[in-house]
Amino acid sequence: MNTFSLKIVTSDGLCYDGQAEELIVRTVSGDLGILAGHCNCVAPLGMGMATVKIDGEKRYGACIGGMVTVLDGNVKLVPTTFEWADQIDADRAYDSEGRAKRILGDKNSSETDLRLAEARLKRALIRQSVAGYKPR
């Protein structure tokens, strides 16, 4: 299968730099699949699972916010946060879910706290889901 150059970069550093056969990411408009020869584009990322096919093997990651760009066969994924499935601390994700649900259930929570808790809950659920896709 044909490959393309893929870089996954966050503010914490480089997560991946190499060839890939396929990338599927969640954008704010829905899922975007990228193969070699994809047209140039820029898209804002939503929150979801990223699937990267490398040497015939699929790897999964929790990809939150940011941008994806395709330019002349080079793909750059620049999410706000990115964690490969095997790097996710599932216990921490479950703790985050519990904290967010407590805030959402508190009648005294401010509108700002509720919005932040909703985002935290969504991130926690995505991280839990992706952690279940660890390559074996």
Question: What residues fall within each predicted segment?
Answer:
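N-terminal export/targeting signal detector
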Residues: 1-5, 133
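Compact, glycine-rich, soluble single-domain proteins
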Residues: 7-99
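Acidic/glycine-rich phosphate/pyrophosphate-binding loops and surrounding catalytic core
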Residues: 82-136
